[in-house]
């Protein structure tokens, strides 16, 4: 069993990112299928799908990097500011960048948001 570093998920199954096509109808994973698996802010790349159980016992498919750092779906215009859940308003973003952005706007987000630059370079290079 693998434990994700940020989310409290117990990952029980891993699939290659190429299997994402099988999930193109899945509400959240559709964002990664249509817009890619790279954080729009720091460039961190999702390379695998992990199926895990959260602390409430619910199972989810999520996108992870090689070292199981999660990518999330971000609202370009935050819901708190009237943004929708439509695909046009959603983008892939790593967990750290998404937390840093909060309910702010993309243009206000510092592109060097404390993400490990060496790790980012490693994922971009591979």
Predicted ranges, named:
Residues 70-73, 78-99:
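Short beta-strand-alpha-helix junction that forms the catalytic/metal-binding core
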Residues 9, 16-20, 54, 68-75:
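A generic structural signal for ordered alpha-helices
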Residues 1-30, 34-36, 43-47, 118-126:
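A boundary/linker detector
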Residues 59-81, 114-126:
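Short microdomains enriched in Cys/His and/or Lys/Arg
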Residues 25-71, 94:
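Short cysteine-rich loop/turn motifs with clustered Cys
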Residues 90-116:
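Short Cys/His-centered divalent metal-binding micro-motifs
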Residues 50-53, 87, 105-108:
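Generic domain-boundary/flexible-linker signal
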